[in-house]
Each structure stands twice: as structure tokens, then as C-alpha cells.
């Protein structure tokens, strides 16, 4: 495998995500969230871990039955089968990295972006096909 160097500007924009790296063993995306966005629905992944590294601002997570506030420099990881929800920005614009190990989640983001562009909402079958199990 070749070395991978990627700027944010050269990443693939998929909804609110910019995919920075997409490999079999790792997928990294960057998000910018404004305060007031709705949290994601609680879910878990059976086949991969989902990690979030806060670059700037504060995020609030629902993970493993708790609410956790993460400031810049904090890493939050939901290992396989741990229930969590996509975070919300607290107080100000927030930037963070989302890491999936192993990789492959970029396909989910692409299809989700296409669905939203058509005004569609993903159903449970779509979610489960992409290792996302609502609870």
C-alpha cells in the first residue's frame, strides 16, 4: 500500500462529512457541526468500532447509557456492540474526526447522501446492511 496524504479540501464531501481516508482497515472522516443540530439515533455496530476525536469545540455524546461531554483533544470510542449516538455540538461550532475500524463505512455515507438528496429516509433494512443496528 502507498502512503496516503490527504488535505480536507481534497477529501470526498458526503453530506456533512468529508472523507479523508477510506481503506479496508480504516475510514476517517471530518465533520463540522453547528450548535442546535439533532443527535443521531442510538445504535450499535456489530463489526466495527466507531471513534470520535474532537479537534475544536465541545461535543455531547450518548454512549453506553451515559451522556458524555468531550472537549477539544478528547477521544471517545464506541467498541463493537456498544450503543451510542452521533454527537451534537455544544455552545459553538465544533470540528471532529470520526474513525471507523475496520473501514468500509464510506459506502454507507455515499448511499445515505444520495438518499437524502432524493428526500428519502433510511429504513432499518438499509441501516443493518451497513452494520448499523438501531436500538
Where are the regions that the model predicts?
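Short acidic-glycine-tyrosine-enriched beta hairpin
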Residues: 65-83
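Short, conserved beta-strand element in jelly-roll/cupin
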Residues: 30-34, 44-62, 99
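Short beta-strand segments
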Residues: 40-42, 63-68
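Acidic/histidine-enriched, glycine/proline-rich intrinsically disordered or flexible terminal extensions
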Residues: 107-135
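A short glycine-rich, His/Asp/Glu-containing loop-to-beta-strand
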Residues: 8-42, 48
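Ligand-binding loop in jelly-roll beta-barrel domains
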Residues: 60, 80-106
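Well-ordered beta-strand scaffold positions
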Residues: 26, 58, 66-68
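Tight coil/turn sites that cap or link beta-strands
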Residues: 35-37, 73, 81, 91
Amino acid at each position: 500500500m502507498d502512503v496516503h496524504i490527504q488535505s480536507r479540501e481534497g477529501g470526498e464531501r458526503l453530506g456533512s462529512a468529508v472523507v479523508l481516508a477510506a481503506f479496508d482497515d480504516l475510514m476517517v472522516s471530518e465533520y463540522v457541526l453547528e450548535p442546535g443540530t439533532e443527535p443521531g439515533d442510538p445504535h450499535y455496530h456489530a463489526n466495527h468500532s466507531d471513534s470520535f476525536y474532537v479537534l475544536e469545540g465541545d461535543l455531547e455524546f450518548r454512549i453506553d447509557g451515559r451522556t458524555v461531554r468531550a472537549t477539544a483533544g478528547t477521544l471517545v470510542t464506541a467498541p463493537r456492540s456498544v450503543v451510542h449516538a452521533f454527537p451534537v455540538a455544544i455552545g459553538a461550532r465544533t470540528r471532529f474526526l470520526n474513525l471507523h475500524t475496520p473501514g468500509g463505512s464510506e459506502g454507507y455515507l455515499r448511499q445515505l447522501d444520495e438518499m437524502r438528496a432524493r428526500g428519502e429516509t433510511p429504513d432499518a433494512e438499509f441501516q443493518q446492511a451497513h452494520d448499523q443496528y438501531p436500538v
